[in-house]
Amino acid sequence: MPSFKTLDDLSDIRGKRVLVRVDLNVPVKDGKVTDTTRIERVAPTILELSEKGAKVILLAHFGRPKDGPSPELSLSLIAPSVEEVLDHAVSTASDCIGEAAASAVAAMNDGDILLLENTRFHKGEEKNDPDFTKALAANGDIYVNDAFSAAHRAHASTEGLAHHLPAYAGRTMQAELEALEKGLGDPARPVVAIVGGAKVSTKIDLLMNLVKKVDALVIGGGMANTFIAARGTNVGKSLCEHDLAETARQIMIEAATSGCAIILPEDGVIAREFKAGAANETVDIDAIPADAMVLDVGPKSVQAISAWIERASTLVWNGPLGAFEIEPFDAATVGAAKYAAERTTAGKLTSVAGGGDTVSALNHAGVADDFTYVSTAGGAFLEWMEGKELPGVAVLNAAR
């Protein structure tokens, strides 16, 4: 089990300057925040520290600035939404280091919340530059990392600061790490993984790691076609990476060696065009017409997947089973997700899901709140599933 300090380990922090790394990389349209999910996720940590009398100093990046500061990527655009979610005044500073930051921090009272400017306005952030890290650390007494979604990056505000200040995991980071530990670290068995999405090429490391750790691996989405084709079955005009047939075979061999069952679709929903309401039919997977494409797994496959979910004590899910954005090719994803949610709410399954499309798919199915844990961290969640060490997490464990 990862061992890290949490807010429970912080005693008297009244008047202490607490630097909190948060993820405020939210979508903005016409100057307005369109989705406050990430702000809502970090609110408990911020408010807990504020209520305990700390001076709460928020560090975050926003977008990918190319050459220093740019007004459209200023965190001052996000501040009103942060205030709204927290229902608490939030002041801002025009920089995250130097005189502007120092004077804003000096003006704080106990319990105040200050949002410093975009850390990526300085090249030292992404380079994890020691001088830049020291300049950030100068404004704090304690460091709290609550940005799991940026933990796969060894940047100054996500990794470097933990070498300069006492380091703790915030509540979101803590919840994420505890959920992930239940998912793959030390899970209740049997463990079933569902991996979908379009391409095998983006998930080779993930699949290779999972077959060594789970009892069954369900492969869906466009990537299933690559595995089906690798077995010598014609997949018609379906999305398929034929050049990765050998990679798919290697993954299947590794699975057999590790005692992991690979579950591929038995049937598929096919169409001749990729559009909502397109004429479609369900065929066995070895009867795909040459002029058709598979856009979802079929009902027999969903039954088989549900049977594996029923057997499982733990489910890890990344990626949709079909082209869920377009009806009726959302049926398999919705069906399997609803069954997993049902088992979870009945207390019979620990279900952990993550990755951008996965969150959208579970929201589409209306069951995201019924899973044990749904991670909003894209890249960090995938790298964790690939078995890679995350710098932002490793440094918290070291700080223990």
Curated annotation (Swiss-Prot):
The keyword 4Fe-4S does not apply. It is found in: Cytoplasm. GO terms for molecular function: ADP binding; ATP binding; phosphoglycerate kinase activity. The keyword Nucleotide-binding applies. Pathway: Carbohydrate degradation; glycolysis; pyruvate from D-glyceraldehyde 3-phosphate: step 2/5. Keywords: ATP-binding, Cytoplasm, Glycolysis, Kinase, Nucleotide-binding, Transferase. GO terms for cellular component: cytosol. GO terms for biological process: gluconeogenesis; glycolytic process. It catalyses: (2R)-3-phosphoglycerate + ATP = (2R)-3-phospho-glyceroyl phosphate + ADP. Substrate binds at residues 23-25, 38, 61-64, 120, 153. InterPro entries: Phosphoglycerate_kinase (IPR001576), Phosphoglycerate_kinase_CS (IPR015911), Phosphoglycerate_kinase_N (IPR015824), Phosphoglycerate_kinase_sf (IPR036043). PROSITE patterns: PGLYCERATE_KINASE. ATP binds at residues 203, 325, 355-358. Its EC number is 2.7.2.3. Monomer. This is Phosphoglycerate kinase. It comes from Rhizobium leguminosarum bv. trifolii (strain WSM2304). The gene is pgk.
